[in-house]
């Protein structure tokens, strides 16, 4: 899980979702998991 000010899709499997007011990137590649913080 990377914590970043700006979350971006890194590949075509990445999805940007908002959970409980937190922007996250979910992906089949665990290295691409991000959250805004």
From Swiss-Prot:
Keyword Zinc listed: no
Organism: Actinobacillus pleuropneumoniae serotype 3 (strain JL03)
Keyword Disulfide bond: no
Parts of the chain that traverse the membrane: none
Any one biological process term the GO annotation gives: translation
MF (Gene Ontology): structural constituent of ribosome
Family: Belongs to the bacterial ribosomal protein bL36 family.
UniProt GO cellular component terms: cytoplasm; ribonucleoprotein complex; ribosome
Entry protein name: Large ribosomal subunit protein bL36A
PROSITE patterns registered for this protein in UniProt: RIBOSOMAL_L36
Gene: rpmJ1
Keywords: Ribonucleoprotein, Ribosomal protein
